[in-house]
Every structure is written in structure tokens, then in C-alpha cells.
Swiss-Prot record:
Keyword Transcription: yes
Example GO molecular function: zinc ion binding
Pfam families, per the entry: KRAB, zf-C2H2
Keywords attached to this entry: DNA-binding, Metal-binding, Nucleus, Repeat, Transcription, Transcription regulation, Zinc, Zinc-finger
The keyword Repeat is annotated on this UniProt entry: yes
Species of origin: Homo sapiens
Zinc finger (C2H2-type): 199-221, 227-249, 255-277, 283-305, 311-333, 339-361, 367-389, 395-417, 423-445, 451-473, 479-501, 507-529, 535-557
A single GO BP: regulation of transcription by RNA polymerase II
PROSITE patterns linked: KRAB, ZINC_FINGER_C2H2_1, ZINC_FINGER_C2H2_2
InterPro entries in the record: KRAB, KRAB_dom_sf, Znf_C2H2_sf, Znf_C2H2_type
Protein name (database record): Zinc finger protein 543
Any one cellular-component term (Gene Ontology): nucleus
Principal cellular location given in the protein's record: nucleus
Length: 600
């Protein structure tokens, strides 16, 4: 036989089909053996570059389902021994060209004896009483390699060279078994060994009932992936995984939802999807009673109770509950930023960050609040915003009892009690409680001002400053005093103004007891007690306790007239005189609630 000989094979040449009655009479061991051999045969054919056949059959083989249903459309025969040629309605293997050395040649003997004579049945209308099916494997170098590979997975379930595994099929009867072995061949011996023995992994000590399962498990430790996809080169440790993967390339989605028509390439994906329609949540937490649709979500939730974090970063030792979280974290160490914006070229280490960034260019805010109409880029932002309307504050501080509507706000608050300042500046060593404050501080060293006003070009280091500045151009004053109707463009200005009506002075000097409306006024006042004069004139060295006083003094050196014109035709009045007059008319307390900028 030439090494390059090619033959055409149909699915019937390598498959064995059963009726529902026949399949029901097989015991568990016989079914398992059949399914494993069929799966391995399929994987072998795929590794040789053969086209993918029906994914339904692969799924049923892999999940131990009723195989007579998977193959009943391939044959009209009621039993395997029927001499009538099966009528194939939809062949799954169509003219597969294979090397002859690796073909499984099914030989139906025509006798009840070993000399292949056709046995005569007592009932001529039924099937023959004795039929011997010999499964013989051709001899050749390619066959030897494949046989060795299969034997390593099944502990010698394949036959030796030239040895025929003989299984005698008796007449089908509802009273007896379908198959009876007349001799202990290699297949039977292997099954007996697997029944009696257990197989233990030397790496982790895990025990398996079958050697095939042990071999598959050991690939976790050895990282061996012998099954390679011919389309993309991706490798797999199991042939079934390769078969499932190949459906991605074919684009076939045979599992369709009857409710909405959505299709899937795996039955398990369809099952999970159908729970959306049924509302089924089969995975319930025994700790808190919360139920979940998917097992993976349930496992992650359960770790929140146990505190288990099995995924540990080898670089910094940080642990994570799930693998995606670990992968996202690890990119920090590698510095990789694979997600790049096509508009401006900015790169990100997470896809979600790129998505958020792209909304700056598009301006899309698809998530709108039903209460106030405010729109958001992310659904999570909308959910957090909605708590403002409900007033719910589920996150409570155990130290002081203060409640918050966000977990992050609670964590930030708790640092007040612990004194923790995890964000330290590498330039000056100053530490900060909040990351946002730390980022703003770093910009004082770098001089970065990323927020620029489109109207006047003025740049700011903080986004909030840009928003406050922009109201100057719009003239908008959304903050109105309910007492007098005066409007302001900043909420802080409204707060200061309202203290005129309330007379509230929350900032009190601990030295003399004098109270102030603003903390800035208290700070300036406290310098009187300390005697500190931090503002020094560079010309003469004279020091002052206020910046405004230094500015007024420097006019002496510059020769600038320190007077202001109040009105045309009226006499000049010095700034100090103006202050004295205002003190007489309005009182000193009024000056404490006005800014120095307004005085000059």
C-alpha cells in the first residue's frame, strides 16, 4: 500500500448509529466508551484538515446526550446489522480525502464462524443471529504516530498492530443485553483496569477515575495543547475545544432562541440567554440569599463573603477575585496601552477607558435620567446619579454613623478616621487622602493645564475651574438668593451672600473669640495674634501681614499714584481714607464679609 494513497470516506464509514431502542439497552460504560471514541475520531479527522461537520453532534457527544437522536437522520436502518444501504438525508462527512494508513476499515463478516460465513437466522424475517464486526487499523508510519497519541490518552484502548478487536452482536431482544463480548480483547481489559484503578496526578494529587481524564488534566501543568486550528493557529488541550472553536470561523449558529430569535453557536450560551426570558436564577447564595442567573457571577459573589482572592500579581503581590480584574491590573506593570483613539491618537490600557474617551469627540450621552433629564455617557453614572433623587444612602460609616450614597465616598470619608493618606507626591513628599486632590497637586509641579476655554483660550488645571470660568462668558447666574433675589454664578458666592441675611459667623478665633463668615478672613485675622508678616517688599525689605498691604506699599517705589478717582469733579480720596469712611458708614463687621478685591 503506497504511503500517499488517498481514498474517499463518507460519514457512514467511520460512524456507528443506533436506534432509540438499541441505545437504551447500552449500559453506562458502553455509552461512555462509544462517545469517547467518536469524539477522538472527530478530533483526529479535524486535525488532518477535514471540514467541520454538524456542531449539534459534537455538542451531544461532548455532553453525553442521547446519540441515537443525533444520528437518526443519517440512516433509515433499524439496527446496525441491517444489510440495506443506509439512506443519508444530510451527510456530515462528504468525501473526506484521508491517507489510507489512518483509515478505520469496517469489515462486516458474512458468517457466524471466524471463517466469515454468513450465519443463518432461525427467524428469516429478522436480522441474522450472529454478525461479527471487525475494526481493523491499517499499518503505516502515520498510523503509528496517531495510534501512539491516542493510546497515551486512553491507556491502551486502541488495538495492537494486526490485532482485531472482535465484538459479537446478538439478536436484539428487549429481554437481554444488546452486546456480548465473547473474549477479553484489549478494549475489555482496558475497561476492567479503569473500573478497578484510580489515576492520581503527581503534580497536585488530584485523583481521577479514568486515565483519559488524568491525561487531559495533566495538560494544565504541562501546558501541552496538541490540537491546533488550521484557520488561525490557536491551540487547545482538548479536541472538543477545537471543534467548538472552529464554529467561530464557520459563523454557524445552530442554537436559536424561540422567544426572540437570537442565535448562538453553543447550546450552553442559548441556555443562559433563555434565563433572561424565564427570569430563572438557579444559583442562590446561602449567605445572603441573593440569586444569580449565571454560575460565574455567583462564584464571584460568593468570594465577597469568603474574601477569597485566588489571582495574585507576581509583581506587587496584589490579589484579585476574578481573572479579568487581574489581567487589567497587570497592564499597569507592563505599561501596555493597546487601545488607541483614532481621532487624537491617545492610548489607553483598558477598552472601557477608550470608550469613555471617544464620547468626548462624539458628544454622545445615551443614558438619560427620567427625573431631571440629565444625560450620561455610562449607565453606571446614571445609576449613581439616580440615588440623588431617591435620597438613598446605603453606605454607612461604622465610626460616626454618617451615610453616603456611594461606596467610594464612604471609603474617602473613612480616611478621616484612619488618617490614611495613600497618595504621596514624589516631588515634594506631600501626601493626600484623595486621588483627585493628588492629581491636581501634581499639576502645580508640571504646570499642566489641560482644560482650555474655547472662548478666550484661558487654561485651567482643574475641570471645575473651567466650568466656573465659562459662566463668565455665558453670563449665566443660576444661583439665586431666596431672600433678596440676587443671583450669582457660583454656589460659593451665594453661600457667602446668604450669611448677610442669617448673620451666621461659623469661623471663630480661638485667641480672642472674634467670629467670621469666611475661613479666609479668620486666617488673615489670626496673623495679628501670631505677629507673622509673610509678605516682604523686595525693594526695602519691609514686611506686611497681608498681600494687599504689600501691594499698596509697593506703589511708593514704583511712583504710581495710590489714589483712585471716585467721580469727575470730586476731590481725590486715598484708599485708606475710603476704608475709614466705609468703616464709619457700614461698620467693621461688614468689611469682614467682603473680599479685598471689592475694596480696591
Amino acid at each position: 500500500m503506497a504511503a500517499s494513497a488517498q481514498v474517499s470516506v463518507t460519514f457512514e464509514d467511520v460512524a456507528v448509529t443506533f436506534t432509540q431502542e438499541e441505545w437504551g439497552q447500552l449500559d453506562a460504560a458502553q455509552r461512555t466508551l462509544y462517545q469517547e471514541v467518536m469524539l477522538e475520531t472527530c478530533g483526529l479527522l479535524m486535525s488532518l484538515g477535514c471540514p467541520l461537520f454538524k456542531p449539534e453532534l459534537i455538542y451531544q457527544l461532548d455532553h453525553r446526550q442521547e446519540l441515537w437522536m443525533a444520528t437518526k437522520d443519517l440512516s433509515q436502518s433499524s439496527y446496525p446489522g441491517d444489510n440495506t444501504k443506509p439512506k443519508t438525508t444530510e451527510p456530515t462527512f462528504s468525501h473526506l480525502a484521508l491517507p489510507e494508513e489512518v483509515l478505520l476499515q469496517e469489515q462486516l463478516t458474512q458468517g457466524a464462524s471466524k471463517n466469515s460465513q454468513l450465519g443463518q437466522s432461525k427467524d428469516q424475517d429478522g436480522p441474522s443471529e450472529m454478525q461479527e464486526v471487525h475494526l481493523k487499523i491499517g499499518i503505516g508510519p502515520q498510523r503509528g504516530k496517531l495510534l501512539e497519541k491516542m493510546s497515551s490518552e486512553r491507556d491502551g484502548l486502541g488495538s495492537d498492530d494486526g490485532v482485531c478487536t472482535k465484538i459479537t452482536q446478538k439478536q436484539v431482544s428487549t429481554e437481554g443485553d444488546l452486546y456480548e463480548c465473547d473474549s477479553h480483547g484489549p478494549v475489555t481489559d482496558a475497561l476492567i483496569r479503569e473500573e478497578k484503578n484510580s489515576y492520581k496526578c503527581e503534580e497536585c494529587g488530584k485523583v481521577f477515575k479514568k486515565n483519559a481524564l488524568l491525561v487531559q488534566h495533566e495538560r494544565i501543568h504541562t501546558q501541552v495543547k496538541p490540537y491546533e486550528c488550521t484557520e488561525c493557529g490557536k491551540t487547545f488541550s482538548k479536541s472538543t475545544h477545537l471543534l467548538q472553536h472552529l464554529i467561530i470561523h464557520t459563523g454557524e449558529k445552530p442554537y436559536k432562541c424561540m422567544e426572540c430569535g437570537k442565535a448562538f453557536n453553543r447550546r450552553s450560551h442559548l441556555t443562559r440567554h433563555q434565563r433572561i426570558h424565564s427570569g430563572e436564577k438557579p444559583y442562590k447564595c446561602s449567605e445572603c440569599g441573593k440569586a444569580f442567573t449565571h454560575r460565574s457571577t455567583f462564584v464571584l459573589h460568593h468570594r465577597s463573603h469568603t474574601g477569597e482572592k485566588p489571582f495574585v500579581c507576581k509583581e506587587c503581590g496584589k490579589a484579585f477575585r476574578d481573572r479579568p480584574g487581574f489581567i487589567r491590573h497587570y497592564i499597569i506593570h507592563t505599561g501596555e496601552k493597546p487601545y488607541e483613539c483614532i481621532e487624537c491618537g491617545k492610548a489607553f490600557n483598558r477598552r472601557s477607558y477608550l470608550t469613555w474617551h471617544q464620547q468626548i469627540h462624539t458628544g454622545v450621552k445615551p443614558f438619560e435620567c427620567n427625573e431631571c433629564g440629565k444625560a450620561f455617557c455610562e449607565s453606571a453614572d446614571l445609576i449613581q446619579h439616580y440615588i440623588i433623587h431617591t435620597g438613598e444612602k446605603p453606605y454607612k460609616c461604622m465610626e460616626c454613623g454618617k451615610a453616603f450614597n456611594r461606596r467610594s465616598h464612604l471609603k474617602q470619608h473613612q480616611r478621616i478616621h484612619t488618617g490614611e493618606k495613600p497618595y504621596e507626591c514624589s516631588e515634594c513628599g506631600k501626601a493626600f487622602t484623595h486621588c483627585s486632590t493628588f492629581v491636581l497637586h501634581k499639576r502645580t509641579h508640571t504646570g499642566e493645564k489641560p482644560y482650555e476655554c474655547k472662548e478666550c483660550g484661558k487654561a485651567f488645571s482643574d475641570r471645575a475651574d473651567l466650568i466656573r470660568h465659562f459662566s463668565i462668558h455665558t453670563g449665566e447666574k443660576p444661583y439665586e438668593c431666596v431672600e433678596c433675589g440676587k443671583a450669582f454664578n457660583r454656589s460659593s458666592h451665594l453661600t457667602r451672600h446668604q450669611q448677610i441675611h442669617t448673620g451666621e459667623k461659623p469661623y471663630e478665633c480661638i485667641q480672642c473669640g472674634k467670629a467670621f463668615c469666611r475661613s479666609a478672613n479668620l486666617i488673615r485675622h489670626s496673623i495679628i495674634h501670631t505677629g507673622e508678616k509673610p509678605y516682604e517688599c523686595s525693594e526695602c525689605g519691609k514686611a506686611f501681614n497681608r498681600g494687599s498691604s504689600l501691594t499698596h506699599h509697593q506703589r511708593i517705589h514704583t511712583g504710581r499714584n495710590p489714589t483712585i478717582v471716585t467721580d469727575v469733579g470730586r476731590p481725590f480720596m486715598t484708599a485708606q481714607t475710603s476704608v475709614n469712611i466705609q468703616e464709619l458708614l457700614l461698620g467693621k463687621e461688614f468689611l469682614n464679609i467682603t473680599t479685598e478685591e471689592n475694596l480696591w
